[in-house]
From Swiss-Prot:
<dbReference type="InterPro" id="IPR047865">
    <property type="entry name" value="Ribosomal_uL10_bac_type"/>
</dbReference>
<dbReference type="InterPro" id="IPR001790">
    <property type="entry name" value="Ribosomal_uL10"/>
</dbReference>
<keyword id="KW-0699">rRNA-binding</keyword>
<dbReference type="GO" id="GO:0070180">
    <property type="term" value="F:large ribosomal subunit rRNA binding"/>
</dbReference>
<dbReference type="Pfam" id="PF00466">
    <property type="entry name" value="Ribosomal_L10"/>
</dbReference>
<comment type="subunit">
    <text>Part of the ribosomal stalk of the 50S ribosomal subunit. The N-terminus interacts with L11 and the large rRNA to form the base of the stalk. The C-terminus forms an elongated spine to which L12 dimers bind in a sequential fashion forming a multimeric L10(L12)X complex.</text>
</comment>
<keyword id="KW-0689">Ribosomal protein</keyword>
<comment type="function">
    <text>Forms part of the ribosomal stalk, playing a central role in the interaction of the ribosome with GTP-bound translation factors.</text>
</comment>
<keyword id="KW-0694">RNA-binding</keyword>
<keyword id="KW-0687">Ribonucleoprotein</keyword>
<comment type="similarity">
    <text>Belongs to the universal ribosomal protein uL10 family.</text>
</comment>
<dbReference type="GO" id="GO:0006412">
    <property type="term" value="P:translation"/>
</dbReference>
<protein>
    <recommendedName>
        <fullName>Large ribosomal subunit protein uL10</fullName>
    </recommendedName>
</protein>
<dbReference type="InterPro" id="IPR043141">
    <property type="entry name" value="Ribosomal_uL10-like_sf"/>
</dbReference>
<dbReference type="InterPro" id="IPR022973">
    <property type="entry name" value="Ribosomal_uL10_bac"/>
</dbReference>
<dbReference type="GO" id="GO:1990904">
    <property type="term" value="C:ribonucleoprotein complex"/>
</dbReference>
<dbReference type="GO" id="GO:0005840">
    <property type="term" value="C:ribosome"/>
</dbReference>
Amino acid sequence: MALNLSQKQEVVAELADIAAKAHSLIAAEYAGTTVSQMTAMRKQARETGVFLKVVKNTLAARAVEGTDFAVAADKLVGPLLYAFSMEEPGAAGRLIKEFAKSNDKLQAKVVSIGGELFPAGHVDVLASLPTRDQALAMLARVLSEPAAMFARAVKAVGDKQGGGDEAAAPVAETAEA
């Protein structure tokens, strides 16, 4: 279906708004993917905060101008599916990687994050990035570890010097009346 000029401008404006807010971009070849596979991928994309869109490459190139993904504009060739991670940088990578396992026709061609363009093989690296909750848990562990080490050291010194709890037992006094 051919788009008129105003429709093309709407598509570019929508995609430019998404690209400005997105954390990462993966452009993947999807030729040969069935409708049911694409529907399942779109459903999971909505659940994981990934914006999926199939648009003409010239419109996509115009939309990413002035964003971190402008470095990918020259690589947008062929029929491509655009996956923008809106909530977590690795969400699009996990989505594409998961669906590529069951569909060999789906292949990442462009991977971009933070104004950098990476080879298509880096989709695995992007997919392995921790989620926000995982990153916060790792940070909490890193921050709590020094305190735990100090507590273990104090306990070890206490055990070595007098047996720990036994040294703190009160001595009974006899009362004279």
